[in-house]
Amino acid sequence: MILIFLLVIVFISSTSLGSYASTSELTSKPPINGVVMKGAFVSMKQDDYGSPPAPENYIEDSFKMISDAGLNHVRFVFYWEAYERDPEAFIKEIKSVANAADKYGLKIIYDNHQWHTSSWLEERATGFPWSLFEGNSKYSRGGGGNTLDETAQDFWGDWWDRSIKDKEGKDGWAQMSEFLKQIVLAVDNHSSTLGYEILSEPHVHNKGQWSKIGKFNSFITEELRDITSKTIVYSMNVPIDLNSPINISPKNLAKMAPSNKENIAFKVSVYAVPNGDGYQEKRFDMFLETSDRTGVPLYIGEWNNVVRTKEGVISKLNPELSELTKSDAKQILGALKKAGVWGTAFWRWDYQEVATDSFNLVSYNNGSNLKPTKYLGILEDTVETIYGPAVGKLPSYNAKENNLINALVKTGKLTEDEAKELVTKSMQIG
């Protein structure tokens, strides 16, 4: 221990490095490759009191399996309405994620997720808390949370105008900022914490909203920068149809970026081979050009392979026709590596099964243990084939070593990677 601190003193005295990672530092590091994982309490709808319980030791066992598969990253999904439902259980689970990730050498991005806006608007949906809807007749209960639903369009339009307030008159943006700060305060001092995603796949309904999203992302980024120097991720929008009337283009997507781009990543989803046909290639090229415009690296926060079929005016996921083969996985991940993306996360890891087979990396029956499906094997083999065995695999540290790493980072003189390198070298010296 004395040797470690002697090394630290020498290092600190010879450096004036700040604590932020630049874009070049982000892209020069070994890539992160992993999974999108759903939790238990953090994924509950606000009125959910009947979901099947998670397996015993779900987080711990999952992270061990993920690490054993040669993966080094988890994009961990949570929902704001689950926090409003039970803040204590929510934060307890978030902390358990950070502790287990430290143990197994995984890097976590904590993802503020929404799907179809909120369960207030749609039974299947999860996302925004009910306090933002209650008492406002404009957002009728069950009014629909998808992009084509009028109630959802009203909500998102008001959200970008920053006119949404709860019954007590509290501003929605400020409330989300305070919520995200609770996550940061709970896990930021963990070596496993890579960063935070502001809001997954926000809705865009007209051409005038692109710049407003940029103002929102700038506000949240500025607020979080008061308490963290770790990576902040902002997300692509939905719908992402190239033919939609919202005028999707690299120029407009670039308007979503926060004004402070230090240590920022841009999350996009890829659910087909990027160069599989003209449409998919054009779509992926649009993301690459957006990254070039902003100087912000691409983070493929979701990837898989699906088939969509037309139902009226919209295309919907077809679970029966969707499949992921070894060839598909190699083509997708190969294209992503060639593009030099910052990291990837496969959709998805969850103890609750869904109809699309390839969305299930593990299976679970009550009373049994988590069991890997063939898709975990495909993912493991593909990552090893494309990136090499255990590329970017992170060392594990015990509690004492993690505490030291965190203390070194808090000095403001060492980045997290530098602190880890110092501690690792001291361990090797003995």
Regions inferred by a protein language model and the residue ranges of each:
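Intrinsically disordered, low-complexity coil/linker segments enriched for acidic/polar
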Residues: 412-419
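Short, solvent-exposed mixed-charge patches
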Residues: 429-430
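Active-site mouth of glycoside hydrolases
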Residues: 27-250
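Membrane-proximal envelope and lipid/glycan-remodeling enzymes
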Residues: 36-52, 96, 286-288, 307, ...
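Extracellular glycoside hydrolase catalytic/binding regions
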Residues: 55, 167-342, 363
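Bacterial N-terminal signal peptides
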Residues: 4-14
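Sec-dependent signal peptide cleavage junction
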Residues: 13-23
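Substrate-binding cleft of secreted/luminal carbohydrate-active enzymes
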Residues: 293-407
